[in-house]
């Protein structure tokens, strides 16, 4: 007899929605994430197709460069690349990333809808904020990505994962700027892609589980938190202190989190990796100095070539949305 039949009673429900036993019995799994480094179980990805050819030549400006910077005169660096990606190489590198995740025990769920694919759908991280018990779907700030949420809702529902909410109204929020820090704490970075109304909606949904949300103001030069902060072990984080406020650095110190600074000699998106399990990280192979730093500090690194992927304006973290982690 299926375990859910044990709940066939007219007794009032006394457990909260996120009760692990209830989730596993009714929804098939505990779903969601309580911490950012637990062993990956399921990850949502999208293998890039011909949709990427719809982008303009300087496509990286759309994803990694804040649109606000287009209104500022003068010389400054933005995270763009001077050429469009080669689709065949892009697919090969994406496949290699997926293979690396499978070797770490992850099941890949593909978001495939090439007929209706949006140009930047490869960056599945932005589709939602995965929290204990389910996902909060994003509302994108740019029209070029706006339709991705509908496709994500369909695929995530098909997988059987609870959708706990969706950013609505005039709120905007994207998953690349969100992470669970521990079972009681989450962090969101505010930028032109994540506004106060979006943060308020995330905070309200998290409050049902008693989870505190820390909102970090990001500089105008970046759009997502994952360009500046990545947990790599239970008590270790890779950071770019030039992109984070002092009080957040102090908050991490107060939690006894050891901070490792991404090497400025490495490519910009070196920090944009993913923890496959505690102390084991998949990282861009081009970030040799940072890889050396991580290795010397007890973090195992699985290098993957993303030289073509970054031409789209994103990295490894951007291409992966874990739906379930251990712990």
Per-segment meaning from a language model:
Residues 1-327:
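The feature marks the mature, well-folded catalytic cores of soluble enzymes
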